[in-house]
Amino acid sequence: MNVKIRKPWGMYEVLLDEPDYKVKKIYVRPYKRFSLQYHNHREEHWNIVEGIGTITQDDKSTTIRAGEYAYIPIKQIHRLEGGYKGITFIEIQRGICKEDDIVRLEDDFGRDTDKKVSHQ
């Protein structure tokens, strides 16, 4: 059984961890959101499996729901917020998939941010 990692915004579970890719099941609680962030060494593919939420990619925010897909290229600023029932998605990371490859620009939970870093 995989371990569920609790976060202030929800939780995730690593389903598969290989040298060049990782697969996670992620749940974002209702009206919570993870950091506005980007990654220097990995891209992400999100397949929404349950719920509805708001995805931000660069400066554009849109509604995303079960059955939809989002691609997050390397260095793209992004964030996801859960809707009224939260949102669950399968995330496939490709590249160097380390948990410390997160550059936070904004965070609702007081975690360190780095607004001075260029993501270009």
What do these predicted regions represent?
Residues 2-38, 42-43:
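A short glycine-rich, His/Asp/Glu-containing loop-to-beta-strand
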Residues 58-77:
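Short acidic-glycine-tyrosine-enriched beta hairpin
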Residues 2-7, 79-120:
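Double-stranded beta-helix
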Residues 35-36, 55-57, 91:
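Short hydrophobic/aromatic-rich beta-strand segments that constitute the beta-sheet cores
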Residues 41-54, 58-59:
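Glycine- and acidic-residue-biased ligand/ion/polar-headgroup-sensing regions
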Residues 24, 34, 60-62, 101-103:
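Short beta-strand segments
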Residues 30-32, 41-42, 60, 76, ...:
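A generic "binding-loop/recognition-motif" signal
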